[in-house]
């Protein structure tokens, strides 16, 4: 069927329409066409082979999914179809269908409308359930269709029976129809177009047709029908699609009429016009009264079996084009074919409102003149109208709905329109959905889905009509071009396209249905809800209509494509439910560009819905935020911090992503609003939480207090009073007073900007940028309470740090589990931030502490006691400026053991939380005792924002408080720090008494006061605090795996290498734990061996030996070499006993065999010369040597061989260890300052250092490398 034939037939149809004796002329034309078709049948079927073999059917059925079953039911068995396809007579029916569109007798008209119904029916097999919802929209149309369809069904059912002629009327009809169908093969587009015109009109009318079924339908057929038809055709990609769909039902349906109709959409694969009269006859239009029972009826072959009303309604009412477009029928099919969830944006017309329907009908009427002019130029449009009239007449003759008959029989398209308008006022008050139920109670059964789909389809048809009116001109040419899509129909299986469209529509429709109840919550019945939604959304439909007007046919095609993108909308179904159905449909229907507008209009309406979901969403979030302060600080940090990141991304970038995800901008907008609202509320609480969390990141005391106050701004005075027990409260308070202002200032802006956390971070940076001048001011010495540090185990300190809100005593006694939990949470945060990869165990352990942390803790306890006794004197002593100095420019001061332990606790929790900033403890911002809480809070917030920010923030906060607290705390700290850790610890207690309570001291301690205050004073880099708590091997293994997975996910080689090295440290800790626990199943030697391999792999990522290698690469190489060296030495120590045994055994063996060896003449001296003779060489050969009695070499037992190999492997570890150590020494020369600071801060690393010291030393170095490389 080429375009020429199509238009030629179209012209014939037009002439027929102009003929007054249409039935006679149509009959003649049918006969003529039948003859032509018969002549062209062979060529057509062979040349075009429209459907080849039903590979699609097999494909779908093989999948075994519901859709495949539906398709199978729809298409029927191909074997059954073969006969029909092979028969010329059946092929005539199937192939000639396209001609049905134009010159058909009134029966053909009813057929035209019926074809869509059949198509619908055929579609129903898959889509019955899906279309069931759709049928409701066109109840009036259904009535018209029902009349037409009943008549058509009768005639059609008889057609299948008679195949051509059945009853006199039907005989002519059938004869004409076979001809028509045959000719339709030639002119499939015409039938499609007519069907489109009929159903598109019906679709737009669906809302209105319910009100005035016959007239509106007939009227809309020429108007919106034509446009919709074209749109649908375009959407269907070609008239042929519709043709195929039309034909598909007919041809194979001889055996399975309903299947054929259902296969009408799917059957297009069959070469002959599947939409044959026979199938149409089989699809006797009886089911308008019946609810869609499902595919069973559709698949039922008996021609008498009437498809469910919904099928006929949805399909009969819908133009096949609409079916192709997946509009109403697609909507219904959506329900049924969720898999192919291709939401059809075109399907979404917001207004199914009675008034909207009236407007649509009017527009369609207006379209009828304008569009009809265009379409009248297009014979198919006229044919569709007049055919509709004829169909109506036929249906009136045969159908039970006589009022409609009378209207359709007596009324011209204009008259029908007037009648429709008359009917409209009657039905308009009633929801179109209600009208639909009236026409079809069964439809109401599907009304739940159908009502929304109906409203969508009606509104869609309305918008389509409007858009067609506006786009009629623009679309007119495309319609002409529409036939061009035929090749795709011939080449491409139309059922596939249609199903995709329908499925997309189904999803959108389903979403729409859900949304409709959501929006019109007050209206329980989906029908009523759609009406309200439609009414509310009216403006939106107009917008939607406007959009279609503006958009070209390409846009329509795009819309088709969009439905697929909208498939993503299932994810946003919740949002859709929140949005009004109309809104959702509008967004679907409208192209992405204009959807936002519609959404905007609906947003207020949506917001009404949104608040509920938002309330739900926000409520949990807010609850979480509210609860977060209440639960242990560790929880608050993790939970509060986590929710915040979620919210942040959503309002910022995620909104765009969400838009992408949720194609519907409307959906996106409400969602974004929802998030904004929930985020604004939750963000407020989250900001508070975050602030409190940040405060938490600060000393535990501060966080605890801040949480208690549940405001980011803590009552610093209270904190100061509580925290500065030993320090002069006045000084600390004085220091605190400024920090509170800063804190409040920082916090308030943070709160303001918390919704966009990026902004919040930036704000902190700005604050830090202000502070830089203050950064020069060193922060007061570390302020961890010596008592707390000493009393608290490292684990407990970490736990307390996590629980910062808890009091000192509580923190001290908090179980290590809390600390572990907190580190894990923090690590999760770290995973998010991917800043500090330090495992929680690492952060808790202060690197500077001696390997014997127990001794340190005992010392700390003693120091605490001493500090308790001498806090005042110590405070003045702490004046030493070196202690004030920020190790990393951060104010954190290391209270050595106490401060470190506290800092380890706080920082361990903080780093995990804000590892993104500095490595765990790195972000600890040392704040002077009393000031520490306030400063720490503000500084911590800044630190949370940025690692650099932390440095500045610490400097800034101290700058404010430094005068007071620095004078006190720093003086005491420095004085005490003159001594080693003990002095520092004593100083720390004094400062800590006030400062540690605020747990800011811990934060400051991360600032890395070295064991030797004088040496550490020179260090300007941040110091990590490490947890001395002991964990089992599994704990370290999990940490190592996390770090390794992070490294695996990275693409930047340096960052990957650093993370692998960090993971290797955790594996090393795991091996060390295995050594401690004899019950561990895995050998620590194996763990170390695997760790060595990981380190070697990490070193291969960067070629440090290259002249282009950066200092960072060389520094990393040094750290890796140190690790490798100590690991090799450790491996040797683990196997040293075995090596000694092997050595003894080997020595004994060689001694025993020494005499034998001397007795045996050596092959090398067989000829009396130093060089072996050829004979001796031969003797030495492995083959001959063993069997040679005289000169045979001594055979070495396998046992000795293995012992020697093992001995070599073990001893080689020593060689490798020293070799790598030497390499590290060489590379260290290029970065003396870096490693000098590292040695100063962490203590020199030697070949005899413990694995714990190694891990802390290297981890501290890796932290600095991250900072230098901006990886934190």
Swiss-Prot record:
The modification Phosphothreonine is found at residue 482. Residues 165-179, 210-227, 715-734 have a biased composition (Low complexity). GO terms for molecular function: G-quadruplex RNA binding. Residues 155-164, 387-396, 620-633, 815-831 have a biased composition (Basic and acidic residues). The keyword ATP-binding does not apply. Residues 841-850 have a biased composition (Pro residues). GO terms for biological process: learning or memory; mRNA processing; negative regulation of gene expression; nuclear speck organization; regulation of gene expression; regulation of RNA splicing; RNA splicing. InterPro entries: AF4/FMR2, AF4/FMR2_CHD, AF4_int. Its main location: nucleus. Residues 634-644 have a biased composition (Basic residues). Keywords: mRNA processing, mRNA splicing, Nucleus, Phosphoprotein, RNA-binding. The modification Phosphoserine is found at residue 395. RNA-binding protein. Might be involved in alternative splicing regulation through an interaction with G-quartet RNA structure. This is AF4/FMR2 family member 2. It comes from Mus musculus. The lineage of its organism: Eukaryota, Metazoa, Chordata, Craniata, Vertebrata.
